[in-house]
Amino acid sequence: MSSKSRSDIHNPLEDRRASSFAPRYVTDVAYAPTFTHFAAPAWLDLTALLAAVAPPARRSGFAWCELGCGRGVTATIQAATHPLGAFHGIDMMPGHIADARRLAERAGVANLTLHALDFAAAADLDLPRFDYIVAHGVYSWIDSQSRETLRHFVDRHLAPGGLVYISYNAMPGWAADLPFQYLVHALAQSAVGDSIAKFAAAEATMRRLGAAGTRALNNSPIFARELAKQRKRLSPAYFAHEYLAPAWQPLYVTEVRTELAAIGLHAVGSATLRDNFDSFVLRAAQRSALHEIVDPDLRELARDCMLLTRFRRDVFSRDAAPISARERRGRLLGQCFALTQPEALVKYAMPTPGGTVRFDNDVSHSIVTELADGPRRLVQVAGPADDLLANALALASAEVIRPVESDAVPVGALNAVLDELDTEAAPLPYRALPCGTALALDTALRRHLREGRRLPPRLVGWPGFLARAAAGG
């Protein structure tokens, strides 16, 4: 590849081909730049290993594709931290892809190719067979025809043994919020301005309706409680894209599995790691009741009804090979993990719908202490193997630690660009780690690192932690 990244090459036909998707999606405002750590190869590999399924072989290279890549933050960070991979990002909004190309060019990322196309046009491209195909959130924002074209892309371009990550708004967790979404979408149609302004106008009307005693709104968890909290941490563009998409529709797990079974895909597990362990999220009586349901898809549906699941991160495969319990154990012990926070801030407990899972013991503390000096393979930590596995999986489920790559790569240039693009008006809080992931940093911490501002006491341990992480251990 030449010194000029393929991410810079603009095809004038792309804008026209992408525009065919526009009426079925919010396109007048750009979505906020986001990083999805669940889409990392190491994270998806761990999900496969938990299910005793062989992850893709990556030693000699691999291919990864994101459908609905937005402004390319996830794709760029993954490409930069996995130089042996061939990365592709596809999004039907030309503005998103233009931003993604600028980010990749400025960061010097040469193994990322970006396409401003809808899924139907992308399916016809001459692309590699992908070991990983990821689609974060988009599956429940698009209509049935667009979901079909997404599946056609997967069917055509998934490599043998490849993994597919699809996350989506799920039922029945959204059931109480359906009237809220329907009403905000309907009210927004008569408002003026762009989608952000339309959502704001619709929300203002709904606040007056709620105050007057509109039961369908006041019984909505999103409207009654969550929306105000979300406004403090999410971009206004999020609300426009989340709630004003014409085809917005939360899906039952059985609907998604049935659609993907039509192209030969079967469920592997959940990228929400704790959801792979009934003992973490279900009470004993719930586990007993579910045990009576033999069909795995119906069992998962009943489980979602128990938990009122509202978001799923499902991993699928067509033909990934099963592995023995012995191989699974060995590969899990060989997995490299990284700490996601300073050691002093770690909480050795995880609240779940089934109660609080506690792992405040010597083995968990040993794992965290070892990882405080940088990423390590689990086998490098002293302790009984079975205890190490059990506690590492609890720590990973609580996102105290993450599965990462064992080989560190330089990320200074990428982080310098991310820092330059990070402004108060348009926050970009993510900073890459050399081990193949990125962390979202607190605003005050980013100001301290950039400008030397006083650091709040709650963040005192972070600069040293990040310095060690940046050094790759």
Regions from the language model: what does each represent?
Residues D124-Y132:
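A short acidic, Gly/Pro-enriched loop at the edge of an enzyme's catalytic core
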Residues D278-E292, L298-R312, F316, T356-G473:
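Long, charge-rich, low-complexity alpha-helical segments
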Residues I166-G193, L209-R215:
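Conserved class I S-adenosyl-L-methionine
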Residues K4-L125, P172-P179, A471-G473:
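N-terminal charged/capping segments associated with class I S-adenosyl-L-methionine
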Residues R231, S235-D373:
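C-terminal lobe and adjacent flexible extensions of AdoMet/dcAdoMet transferase-like proteins
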Residues D131-Q145:
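A short SAM/SAH-binding and catalytic strip from SAM-dependent methyltransferases
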Residues F199-L227, S235:
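Glycine- and hydrophobic-rich flexible loops that cap the catalytic core of alpha/beta enzyme folds
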Residues E148-P160:
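A short glycine-rich, Lys/Arg-flanked "PGG" loop and its adjoining helix->strand segment in the class I
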